[in-house]
Every structure is written in C-alpha cells, then in structure tokens.
C-alpha cells in the first residue's frame, strides 16, 4: 500500500499508487508521489515514467475523511500543497510521463492526468471534477488541457463526468483499451519513447514545457486561493461534512435563500 517505484532494464520506471479502497490519497501520499516521479526523472537510467494505480480506479482525489478528522486548516493546507507538488512533479519530470487510467479519475486525478505527456485509459474509465459538490475549487487548469474550453466549464459547473472515449475524440486520450490490456498498452507506448535517445527526449520535454501557453502551476495555485476563501467562509466544511456523513453531494435545498 502507498507509492511504489520499479525500474526495469529498458529505461522504464513504473510508479504505482495503491491506497485502497478507491485511491483517495492522504496528504503524505501526495508528497510521496511527487518525490517518486521527480526521483525517477533524475535517474539517468530512466528514459520514461509510467504512472498507474492498483484497485478499482486510478484516483479519487484527496482523502476528505482525513481532512474532516483534523481540527483547523492544517490538513487542508497539507492536501493543497501536496496536490500542487504532485501535479508539478508530473509536469516537471525530466522525462515523459505516461499515465494509465483505470476505472475512475476524479478530483486530484485530473491534475495528474492533465499534466501528463501521454494518456491511455481503460474503456470503462471516466474523468471528472466533483469539486463544486465538495465546496472546493481546483484542477480546472488541468481539465482545460483535456477538453475544449466550454466543455470544461460545463463539466466543472455540473460536476459531470466524461468518458475515455469522449476524451479520445477530443484528442487528449491517446488510446482506449479493455482494462486487461491497459498496462501492456502503456508499456508499449513507453517502450517506444524509451528506445529514443534519452538526451534528445529530455530536451524535448523541457522545450515543449517551455512553449506551453499556460503556466499550469501558477494557474492552479490561483484556483486554490478560492478554495481557501470557501473554507474561511465555512462553506467547504458544510459540503465535506455532508459528503462524509451521506456519501452524497450537499442538497441544493440547503442553499441560502435571498
């Protein structure tokens, strides 16, 4: 359980996330994930990274139960800093990162996938940001890298999911395969990258990031500022408490009137 890394003789490092039952990652886990990805990129024997997960789904975001069990804002700050570190690590990793998405990818998972270089997904995979149903904001920056602008806004405001097939149509998911073929597919793509001259590939990663029209790190931190505002106003706790108690979004009937 936790974050593990393995490197094979072909220059492929596989980073695996395993936090049963749904891969809702605790604060410490986000920092460990960031370290694992960055360490892989620093290793001269690593030519490409595969980021994958065990279990029912790729990622369920932050561990909300951990956050609600902690007094004050310490857990929130840790979770936000951890997410920012992990998202940035995928983006800044010195070699390309291939993500293999199984089942579901929501919340913080979108930040990881949106900052990756190559995305492959199982044919049952869904992607989404339930943030507004949790009284929070964040990762619109990364969702906007997966879908067109107005689709991003619609998905964000409604907290609806989008399928792997839809993302493939938009050009963000490279390949959609049956779940049992997901790991092999990710490895096949990674092997093609690993076979190239790693000196050129490392320069290519840095160059492509350099021409990116959006500063994904600054943009995401701006979003997090509004999450803090919602927390200071008490709105976020209302939503998180109801989610922890019922497993469902806060009812619209609880909206303040007037």
Swiss-Prot record:
Reaction equation(s) it catalyzes: (7aS)-7a-methyl-1,5-dioxo-2,3,5,6,7,7a-hexahydro-1H-indene-carboxyl-CoA + H2O = (3E)-2-(2-carboxylatoethyl)-3-methyl-6-oxocyclohex-1-ene-1-carboxyl-CoA + H(+)
Pathway annotation from the record: Steroid metabolism; cholesterol degradation
Ion transport keyword on record: no
SUPFAM superfamilies cross-referenced by the UniProt entry: ClpP/crotonase
UniProt GO molecular function: lyase activity
GO BP: any one term: fatty acid beta-oxidation
Keyword annotations: Cholesterol metabolism, Lipid metabolism, Lyase, Steroid metabolism, Sterol metabolism
E.C. code: 4.1.99.-
EC main group: lyase
Superkingdom of origin: Bacteria
Pfam families given in the database record: ECH_1 (PF00378)
Metal-binding is among the record's keywords: no
Family: Belongs to the enoyl-CoA hydratase/isomerase family.
Physiological role: Involved in the final steps of cholesterol and steroid degradation. Catalyzes the hydrolytic ring D opening of (7aS)-7a-methyl-1,5-dioxo-2,3,5,6,7,7a-hexahydro-1H-indene-carboxyl-CoA (HIEC-CoA) to (3E)-2-(2-carboxylatoethyl)-3-methyl-6-oxocyclohex-1-ene-1-carboxyl-CoA (COCHEA-CoA).
UniProt name for this protein: (7aS)-7a-methyl-1,5-dioxo-2,3,5,6,7,7a-hexahydro-1H-indene-carboxyl-CoA hydrolase
